[in-house]
Amino acid sequence: MKSYAIILGGGSGRRMEADRNKVFLPLRGIPAIVRAIAPFSGLCAGAVVVAAAAEVEEMRGIIARCGLDRFVLRVVPGGAERQDSVRCGLDALPADAECVLIHDGARALVTEDVIRRAIESVEARGSGIASVPVSDTIKRAAPDGRVLETPERAALYAMQTPQAFRVELIRQAHD
C-alpha cells in the first residue's frame, strides 16, 4: 500500500504564548517541523506539508536546509480551519496515494513505530489513530459545572496524531 504523509504546520503558537509558529521553534537545535517530518521518511513514499500562506516560503527553506526536500513533495498553503488544511493536503497528494497519515507538525516526537502501526491499521481496517490511555481523572459536568459522572479511566483514550486512512475514505469524509 503506497503511503504518504500530510504534515500540518499552520499553527500560530498562541496557546503556548510563542511569538511565532511553534513548528519553527527549535528542539535541541532542530526545528520542530523537521523532527515531525523525519520519522515518516523511511515509511512513506513522500509528504505534503501544509503551511500558513504567509509561511510557505519559510517552510520550504527550512525543509531544504534540513535535507528533507526530496521527501517533501510539496509545501502548500492551508485553509482557515484544520479541516480546510487537511483538504488542501489531500488535494496535493499524488494520484498513486492509497494510504495517508495526517500528522500535526507540532508533534515533534512521533516515532517510526507509531507510524508503522498506523499504516498496519489502515491495511487491516481502513483507518487508525495514535492514542494513549488517559491517566487523569475525567469528570463529565452539567452546564452549571456540577459533576454528573466520573467515567471509567480504562475506557478512555487521548487521541493523538497521526490519523491514518485509506485515501478514498478520508476524501469521502471531506466531500
Where are these regions (language model features)?
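Short glycine-rich anion-binding loops that position phosphate/pyrophosphate groups of nucleotides
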Residues: 11-14, 54-55, 80-81, 105-108, ...
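Hydrophobic packing residues within well-ordered alpha-helices of enzyme cores
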Residues: 16, 40, 59-63, 118, ...
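Short beta-strand-to-loop acidic/aromatic patch adjacent to the donor-nucleotide binding site
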Residues: 96-107
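Short beta-strand segments
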Residues: 6-10, 50-51, 102-103, 131-133, ...
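N-terminal glycine-rich phosphate-binding loop and ensuing alpha1 helix
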Residues: 1-57
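Residue-level signal for inorganic ion chemistry
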Residues: 7, 33, 89, 103-104, ...
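Conserved N-terminal catalytic core of the sugar/cofactor nucleotidyltransferase
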Residues: 33-98
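Conserved core of the sugar-phosphate nucleotidyltransferase
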Residues: 109-175
